[in-house]
Each structure stands twice: as C-alpha cells, then as structure tokens.
Design a protein with these regions (language model features):
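Short glycine/serine-rich loop segments
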Residues: 73-133
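Short, well-ordered alpha-helical
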Residues: 1-64, 68-69, 91-93
Length: 133
C-alpha cells in the first residue's frame, strides 16, 4: 500500500497542538521532528529512540528509550516521521481511555462519549486528520 504526502509534518504538528485541548489525545508531541517525511501517530507504548515513551503511566513518566522498536525503524525507512506519542489506557490495560495519569481521551466528534479502546488517542487523532497514519 502506498501513502501520499497529504499533510506536512509542520501542518500535522499544528493540528495536534490545536486539537490537544479538546481531545487530550497526545502524551508527547514531537515538536523537533524532522520536517521531511509523512507524519505518523504512534501509541505511547512503542519505543522511540530519544522520544519520551510512558505507556501513559506515571511510573514511566521520564522514560526515554535508547532504541527504536522494529516497527519504528521500518516506518522511518519507509519515509514516515513520528510526530506524536498518543495517549492510551495506562500500560495498555483497559478499554475506555479514562486514564488517571494523563486524563481521559475525548471522543473525536462527541465530548459526551469516550474515545474507547486501548488506542483511543491514536484513534481520535487519526479521525480528526492530525496525520494520515
């Protein structure tokens, strides 16, 4: 499957910052991301070298991996640029994305509903076109 550059890294970062107060979907926004590449949203439990990775948990609040997960290496080689670590259920344990450490992730279209799932942050950012993937 081929992806086209539908949004720039800078535009993606702008959208994420714009949506964050409404959605609470980002744990770490990668403001110093390289400008080249197709923006990609990563769940906050995927190791990213040099980028804070907390699994949306206070116990990992300051953890910065020294290596990339295999999927991150493959995405980078394919031309993708990580722009955000998205909120999730703490340590991937749950299905609501109502997280005590990072706060609840709000539904992309209805603030009276939950985002749901362990990957709620990724889901709502994708639904609101913060990045193509």
């Amino acid at each position: 499957m081929a992806f086209e550059q539908t949004i720039s890294v800078q535009e993606s970062l702008r959208r994420i910052h714009e949506l964050q107060p409404e959605l609470n979907a980002a744990v770490t926004i990668v403001d110093d991301a390289p400008e080249a590449g197709i923006p990609v949203i990563l769940k906050d439990n995927i190791s990213t070298k040099g980028i804070r990775t907390t699994a949306s948990s206070r116990i990992l609040d300051n953890y910065v991996p020294v290596y990339d997960a295999t999927i991150v290496t493959k995405l980078k080689h394919a031309g993708f640029t990580p722009v955000v670590k998205a909120s999730m259920d703490e340590l991937g344990m749950g299905g609501t994305n109502r997280n005590a450490a990072t706060g609840p992730v709000h539904n992309a279209w209805d603030q009276d509903r939950i985002a749901g799932g362990s990957s709620g942050g990724s889901a709502v950012l994708t639904a609101r076109a913060a990045a193509p993937l």
